[in-house]
Amino acid sequence: MHCPFCSENDTKVIDSRLVADGHQVRRRRQCLACSERFTTFETAELVMPKVIKSNGNREPFDEDKMVGGIQRALEKRPVSADSIELAISMIKSQLRATGEREVPSQMIGNLVMDQLKELDKVAYIRFASVYRSFEDIREFGEEIARLED
């Protein structure tokens, strides 16, 4: 790593520690040329798969879009922000765990519904009604009946 003080290429690591609940490494370094010390932080680069839309188009995963849908479904529902953040993290972890470079949008929708079903049944029905394009009250009733099973 280049020294930020003298731009020399030779530095040594003096100390390393895990920070941010083990998701980051803090390294204390010293330049071998000028002896200045500095700190670096190392995190894993987590690449999300591309999304294959129902029309066949491919686009980058948009976390904001997913979060927006979840928040709309949970609007005015008694669910903590921490629970929502955990659900979002779980969905992203499951997507990365597929090991695929591309995933169908249906997979993301199903993962969101699975998490909403655990968080809040009303939010699940709200999301499912839009996601599955319910046409009439009968479809709502069928989905509610499946929830009760």
UniProtKB/Swiss-Prot annotation:
Q: Which cofactor does it need?
A: Zn(2+)
The keyword Oxidoreductase belongs to this UniProt entry's keyword annotation = no
So which domain of life are we looking at? Bacteria
A molecular function (GO) term: ATP binding
Instruction: List the unnamed ZnF regions, as residue ranges.
Output: 3-34
The Gene Ontology biological process terms listed for this entry are: negative regulation of DNA-templated transcription
Which InterPro entries is this protein grouped with?
ATP-cone_dom, NrdR-like_N, RNR_NrdR-like
Give start-end ranges for the coiled-coil region(s): none
The annotation note on the cofactor reads: Binds 1 zinc ion.
Entry function: Negatively regulates transcription of bacterial ribonucleotide reductase nrd genes and operons by binding to NrdR-boxes.
Family in the record: Belongs to the NrdR family.
Q: What is this protein called?
A: Transcriptional repressor NrdR
Species of origin: Vibrio parahaemolyticus serotype O3:K6 (strain RIMD 2210633)
Q: Which gene encodes it?
A: nrdR
